[in-house]
Swiss-Prot record:
Alphabetized PROSITE patterns for the sequence: RIBOSOMAL_S11 (PS00054)
Function: Located on the platform of the 30S subunit, it bridges several disparate RNA helices of the 16S rRNA. Forms part of the Shine-Dalgarno cleft in the 70S ribosome.
UniProt-annotated stretches for the region Disordered: 1-23
NCBIfam families: PRK05309.1, uS11_bact
Compositionally biased tracts (Basic residues): 1-15
Gene assigned in the entry: rpsK
A GO BP annotation: translation
Name of this chain's protein: Small ribosomal subunit protein uS11
Any single GO CC term annotated in Swiss-Prot or TrEMBL for this entry: ribonucleoprotein complex
Amino acid sequence: MAAQKVKKTRRRKERKNVEHGAAHIQSTFNNSIVTLTDAKGNALAWASAGGLGFKGSRKSTPFAAQMAAETAAKAAMEHGLKSVEVYVKGPGAGREAAIRSLQAAGLEVTLIKDVTPIPHNGCRPPKRRRV
């Protein structure tokens, strides 16, 4: 007897009704990742510069961060998101561009906070580059 195929049904994304949430922008020297969450921290939508097709050194540009923020904002606004608190982490070039893009997409920014981890003289940093 031939084995019957089990048909997998993909779970449909349920539309959450969240009006206020948080936007976490991680901007490194190599990439920018924007995650939009609800008040508890559960992710509603996210996007990264690399995931949008930017490769190599173009991932670290402010334009790539702007596009990532715009894409994530549009996806989160489908869940009813209207206002966000922005938490920025990292030293990358796309920090300000991503914040401006969230505002331009129609989200009201209520708070901007820098949460970049700063060591109290922890690990030894990598050696200086000589170019």
